[in-house]
Amino acid sequence: VMATIGMFIGLSFTFAMILGPIVADAFGLSGLFWFTGFLTILAMLMIQFMVPYSVSKAPRGDSVALPEQISKLIRHPQLSRLNWGVFILHMALTACFITLPKQFVASGLALENHWQIYLPTLLGSFFLMVPFMIIAMKKQQEKPMFSGAVALLSLALFLLWLLPLGFWSLVLSVVLFFTAFNYLEATMPSILSRLAPAGVKGSVMGIYSSSQFLGAFAGGIVGGFVASLYGEQSIFLVMALMSLIWLALSFGMQKLKKSKSFSFITNIHTDERAEEVSELLINMPGIIEATLVQDEPRTSGKGKAHAVAYLKVDEKIVDLLAVKALLHQET
């Protein structure tokens, strides 16, 4: 699910790159803002009238951010690699597009015709990255494929910096850039959800999304600053060096384990019993991670606080019946 969401984020950028020049050419810069406003209203109507009504029964930690956990999660060694990664990825994207459209114009492609190059290059890069996603998931090679995509991103940025200005050199570099970008954009949310500690997925996703948009914000500032001091071509070099830092960080990622998350309402009422059950759970075969949160009220209307157990398990090994029996023992 998370990989699919990531893919559609990448596709939305693809369509934005195609439609942007067309709308701007037809209606001017103000037309872009009117078009964005129209799409926003359309999205609101879709949510209101097309998304099925549902009542969420998800425990609090998996659906919303928990402020008391944010500081700890920011320092999490594995999650921080992804947070810095998405920051650098979107910083590079924003910074590069300060100068990339100008370079296409200089190579002979009129601004209003940029969609003619963005459409095939972005769609081509999308189809190029799909086989690598399939191989990574089927062969359980997510970590080397991930590092390879970051390396490809670095290569594309170095090529944009090194190669002499020309239409086909730009096309080659942009295809490589967006192959890496689309792969990373699609896979990082999935990796993040698998690395997230049990019971704090809402906080983890919040930090990740904030890093993503802060990266886009920083890209505009850093790109403009570098261009004013050293020229626009230097933007590619600075972003390539930043991506090399990310590549070094990616080598420290842990190998991803196949796991599934469960949450259970328990009959545990005291902190002492929660500690005892946590120890028993973590020693059971197939339990990768166990978190018991004592202060979440049940939704049954009784108002009595029961602990919620958040478990990350290996489905091939774990005995869920034994787990449920332990969690529902009367004390």
Language-model regions, residue ranges each:
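Intracellular juxtamembrane helix-capping segments at the cytosolic ends
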Residues: Y183-A196
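C-terminal membrane-cytosol helix-exit motif in multi-pass small-molecule transporters
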Residues: F38-K57, W246-Q254
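Helix-loop-helix hairpin linking two adjacent transmembrane segments in secondary transporters
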Residues: I5-Q48
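Helix-to-loop junctions at the C-terminal end of transmembrane segments
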Residues: L128-Q141
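Structural signature of the two symmetry-related core transmembrane helices
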Residues: P144-F158
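Short amphipathic helix-loop junctions that connect adjacent transmembrane helices
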Residues: I98-N113
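Juxtamembrane intracellular "pre-TM" segments in multi-pass secondary transporters
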Residues: P52-N83
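Loop-to-transmembrane helix entry/capping segments in MFS-fold secondary transporters
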Residues: V1-I5, A198-Y208
